[in-house]
Amino acid sequence: MQTQTYELNFGPQHPSTHGVLRIVLELDGEVVVKATPVIGYLHRGIEKICENRTYIQTVPFTDRMDYLAGMGNNLGISQAVEKLMGVEVPERAEYIRVIMCELSRIASHMICCGSLVQDLGGVTGFVFFIRDREHILELFNRACGARMTFNYIRPGGVAQDLPDGWVAQCRKFLADFKGMMETYDKLIVGNEIFQMRLKGVAPLSAERAIAMSATGGVLRASGVDYDVRKADPYGIYDRFDFKVPLGTKGDNWDRFMVRMEEMEQSARIIEQALDQLPEGPIMAKMPKAIKPPVGEVYHRIENAKGEIGFYVVSDGSLKPYRWHARRAAMINLQLLDELCRGFKIGDVVAILGTLDPVLGEVDC
C-alpha cells in the first residue's frame, strides 16, 4: 500500500502562533515530516529605518522588536551607543536598569509560560499568570508612563528617577511573588497531564543546541551553562549573586522549567539591587545631539528570549551608518523544523510555545 504526505497550513492567524506566523506542515497522517516557518508578515524594516534616525531616536524602535521585554532591548542599544562614546553611566541609573530589565524578564516569562499552559488547555493557569503580570506592568507604568513600549533606558542612563513609593511597591511585589510561584507549582507544575504533554517531547542535545546557535532558555535547557550576564557581564551584573538554571534533556519540559526557575533568580537579583540602590544622578552628562566618533561596536546582553546583540557603525554623523540587531527569537525559531519532526500535530503547539517566539523580533 502506498501512502502520500500532505501539507497543512498552521497560521498565520492561528491563536497558538503567538503572532502572525505561518508554519507549513508536511504530514504523514498526524505525524510531522517537515515544518517550515514562513515569516515576514510583521516586517517593518526597523534596521533601515534606524539608519535614517538619530541615535536617540532608534531607542523606541527596539521596544517594538521584542515588545514583551522592551527594557532589555532599550538597554542593549543604549549600552552600544555608550561604548562608542565612552560614556560612564551613574551608579543609581545602573541599578535602576538592572531592576527594570529583571522585572521585564519576569513579565516576559509569565507570558511565555502562561501562553504555553493555555495552548495545552489550561485556561485557569494562563489567567493566574496574566493577573500576576499586571503588578509588574503597573510598576512600569508608574516609573515611565508606559506598560509595554517604554523608551525608558536611554544612552547615558534612564529617562527619569523612580517616583515616591515605587521601591516599597516593588518590594511588596517581590514578597507576593513567592506565593505566586507556590501557586504555579501546585496548579501547573505538579499537574500530571501537563507533564505528560511536555516530558520527552522535542529533546535537543547540547551539541545540537550549540551547532544550531540556540540561545537563552532554549540553550540552557539542553544543559549548556551559558548566560551573557555570567559569561560576559555587562553593566553591574557582576555584583549580583544568582544561579543559571539548567536542564538535562532539552525537551519541552526542561525549556518550561528553566524559565520558571529564571523568574525566581530574577526576583533574587531585584532584591539585591533594591538593597544596594544608591542615591545620585540618573543620567550622565550627554550632549544634546549624540554624535559618536567614527568606529563600530557590537554589544550583547541576555534578554528574556536569549542573547540579543546590537551592531552599530558610526561615520561621525548624527545617524548610524549601519544598525543591525541579532535577534534571539529569530535564531531559536530556526530550530522548529528539527524539533517537530517525528512528533504529532498537537505537539507542534507545545514545541512552538517552549521556543517562545515573538514575531515583532523575528520579523523586525
Swiss-Prot record:
GO cellular component: plasma membrane
Keywords associated with the record: Cell membrane, Membrane, NAD, Quinone, Translocase, Transport
GO molecular function, one term: NADH:ubiquinone reductase (non-electrogenic) activity
EC class of the enzyme, as a word: translocase
Cell membrane as UniProt keyword: yes
Subunit note: NDH-1 is composed of 14 different subunits. Subunits NuoB, C, D, E, F, and G constitute the peripheral sector of the complex.
Protein name: NADH-quinone oxidoreductase subunit D
Organism field: Heliobacterium modesticaldum (strain ATCC 51547 / Ice1)
Lineage, top ranks: Bacteria, Bacillati, Bacillota, Clostridia, Eubacteriales
